[in-house]
């Protein structure tokens, strides 16, 4: 293991690799609390990033399995939940291990091409997650504000079409991300280092890139979601009890809406710190100290935890998901009873005492 000073030196250079002068790395004064950094880098990063990776992979894979294995759960909302789980799975695969490696190793060991691929998919999956939340909020808006008129629109076919559209748009518009990132090699104090960085020296604007990422992956989608939920709340306040929608159906929609709101709020909270730090770094206002290094690691952990927390939220907030999960774990695969050939309603009613393995709420 490297000495404490070497550990700080490594992480300091990796965090400031965009600046060839390394002006923020003070080799003589930044080691006053070396024991703190040793704990942060050597223990926190592997433990937390490893935990996030395992929970994110297992949890999101279970979400996909539970919904895909139960035909009665194939509603528009659940198709969007599957897409969110897939985006989170890809984010965990392409982001978590490589960010952890960049923190603890003095060299980027994967080469220039893989650097471009990793940065590209980080941006793609981050956008895919948040714009799936936008689609989920739009789905809730239509279900609450236009429950009858939206029945012909909120179909599985249209949900799959919307999902395909956001992936095509994101995969296409994110291509410049791979172009403007790459491996940079440098030497400092007779040591060879390399990092996967934004290639500002080729004329690309780091500030422009970070501002675009901040707006497109955080501000704009959350603004759209906020408008949709404000319209929903206005409609709910003005709506009178009774009407054409049954009380049971209304309660069901409120439960699903509450779950989507919680997922969106958790996303906003988890991603806020790292978005601010990345923006501050792009403005050249970021100074390397033990506090800022620790803050950046904590912010990364918080943002990446968002990719593994959604399955936990479903388990706590959705009785349907808990029932379906138990049936996948303990029941044999269903026989072909005609479900696969018929369009499914948004919500299926449980029969009897709920012990059937074929009908999911």
From Swiss-Prot:
Q: Where are the transmembrane segments?
A: 47-67, 79-99, 117-137, 159-179, 213-233, 260-280, 297-317
Compositional bias of kind Polar residues:
343-361
Which PROSITE patterns does the record associate with it? G_PROTEIN_RECEP_F1_1 (PS00237), G_PROTEIN_RECEP_F1_2 (PS50262)
SMART domains xref list: 7TM_GPCR_Srsx (SM01381)
Write out the topological domains of type Extracellular.
1-46, 100-116, 180-212, 281-296
User: What is any one of the record's Gene Ontology cellular component terms?
Assistant: plasma membrane
Q: Spell out the residue ranges making up region: Disordered.
A: 341-361
Give the subcellular location.
Cell membrane
Disulfide pattern: 115-196
* Record's keyword annotation contains Membrane: yes
Residues modified by carbohydrate are 14, 26, 192
The membrane topology noted for this protein in its Swiss-Prot or TrEMBL record is:
Multi-pass membrane protein
Give UniProt keywords alphabetically.
Cell membrane, Disulfide bond, G-protein coupled receptor, Glycoprotein, Membrane, Receptor, Transducer, Transmembrane, Transmembrane helix
Q: Name one GO molecular function term.
A: hormone binding
Record function comment: Acts as a receptor for A-type allatostatin neuropeptide hormones.
From the Swiss-Prot or TrEMBL record, give the protein name. Answer: Allatostatin-A receptor
Q: Which organism is it from?
A: Bombyx mori (Silk moth)
